[in-house]
Swiss-Prot record:
<comment type="pathway">
    <text>Cofactor biosynthesis; (R)-pantothenate biosynthesis; (R)-pantoate from 3-methyl-2-oxobutanoate: step 1/2.</text>
</comment>
<keyword id="KW-0808">Transferase</keyword>
<feature type="binding site">
    <location>
        <position position="80"/>
    </location>
    <ligand>
        <name>Mg(2+)</name>
    </ligand>
</feature>
<feature type="active site" description="Proton acceptor">
    <location>
        <position position="180"/>
    </location>
</feature>
<dbReference type="GO" id="GO:0000287">
    <property type="term" value="F:magnesium ion binding"/>
</dbReference>
<keyword id="KW-0479">Metal-binding</keyword>
<keyword id="KW-0963">Cytoplasm</keyword>
<dbReference type="InterPro" id="IPR040442">
    <property type="entry name" value="Pyrv_kinase-like_dom_sf"/>
</dbReference>
<dbReference type="InterPro" id="IPR003700">
    <property type="entry name" value="Pantoate_hydroxy_MeTrfase"/>
</dbReference>
<dbReference type="Pfam" id="PF02548">
    <property type="entry name" value="Pantoate_transf"/>
</dbReference>
<feature type="binding site">
    <location>
        <begin position="41"/>
        <end position="42"/>
    </location>
    <ligand>
        <name>3-methyl-2-oxobutanoate</name>
    </ligand>
</feature>
<keyword id="KW-0460">Magnesium</keyword>
<feature type="binding site">
    <location>
        <position position="110"/>
    </location>
    <ligand>
        <name>3-methyl-2-oxobutanoate</name>
    </ligand>
</feature>
<feature type="binding site">
    <location>
        <position position="112"/>
    </location>
    <ligand>
        <name>Mg(2+)</name>
    </ligand>
</feature>
<dbReference type="GO" id="GO:0003864">
    <property type="term" value="F:3-methyl-2-oxobutanoate hydroxymethyltransferase activity"/>
</dbReference>
<keyword id="KW-0566">Pantothenate biosynthesis</keyword>
<dbReference type="GO" id="GO:0005737">
    <property type="term" value="C:cytoplasm"/>
</dbReference>
């Protein structure tokens, strides 16, 4: 059964969140019993083949989120608001967030940053019944302005801004805050200071929950394992090997076999000659 926001807030165990981008992703995540599913704009990187999340559109997010919801009707669903959908004013942000909730069946939206403009959006959405997940630390949508995809909060300035940003998001009405790629001790400090849950990715063990990109934890893409993730399977290698075996059997005329084929009666076939 889907957990409500109060139930998530009162959880005594660490919250488990994974990403999903399609029907089977939602299906498997729900069957595994995760607490929350995030349809992240990371779909731009891991599904659509973009170099960043910037090209991902609102239509992309809605399309993929609807598929995830069909696969996971009973899991709390959070949908990223992609770049540009909450940066042009509160009215536009409200309209876009309502579209996401109405068209996908999502339970909450997520947005990055803690600028005054973003905080105003968070405040307006939360006061109007749209639950919001905040996000501080490394923010992929604007990573170029942060000096690239690298750890945040290791110096006095960025550590203080990260802490203050998380506190400001809570004050604005965010019911949960994602902490990405920050030192573990900073994440613990933020978690201790906040009354709402923190969900970490590359933020150490002391957050109230953890999130991973499913493609990372399944090993869908082969190569070096990311520092912030752990590979629990080798789905990429297994998939490649399976497709190669299929191709080999087709070329050797070993597939399909009789077991994979349909039959017909001799007299029916004879009438065709």
């Amino acid at each position: 059964m889907k957990r409500s926001i109060p139930e998530l807030l009162q959880s005594e165990q660490p919250l488990v969140m994974v990403t999903a981008y399609d029907y089977p992703g939602g299906l498997h995540a729900e069957a595994a019993g995760v607490d929350m599913i995030l349809v992240g704009d990371s779909l731009g990187n891991v599904v659509l083949g973009y170099e960043s999340t910037a090209p991902v559109t609102l239509s992309d997010m809605i399309h993929h989120s609807k598929a995830v919801r069909r696969g996971a009707p009973q899991t709390f669903l959070v949908v990223d608001m992609p770049f540009g959908t909450y940066h042009t004013g509160v009215t536009d942000a409200m309209r876009n967030a309502v579209r996401i909730i109405q068209e996908t069946g999502a339970d909450a939206v997520k947005m990055e940053g803690s600028t005054p403009e973003v905080l105003q959006v968070v405040d307006t959405l939360s006061r109007n019944g749209v639950p919001v997940v905040g996000h501080v630390g490394l923010m992929p949508q604007t990573a170029t302005a942060q000096g690239g995809l690298r750890v945040q909060g290791k110096d006095d300035d960025t550590a203080r801004r990260t802490l203050e940003g998380a506190l400001a998001l809570e004050a604005a009405g965010a019911f949960c805050v994602v902490l990405e790629a920050i030192p573990a001790r900073l994440a613990k400090l933020i978690t201790d200071r906040l009354q709402v849950p923190t969900v970490g990715i590359g933020a150490g063990i002391n957050c109230d929950g953890q999130v991973l990109v499913t493609h990372d934890l399944l090993g869908i893409y082969e190569g070096e394992e990311k520092k912030i993730a752990k590979r629990y399977a080798e789905v990429g290698r297994v998939s490649r090997e399976a497709i190669a075996r299929y191709a080999d059997e087709v070329r050797r005329r070993e597939f399909p076999t009789r077991e994979n084929s349909f039959v017909m009666k001799d007299d029916v076939l004879d009438k065709l000659y």
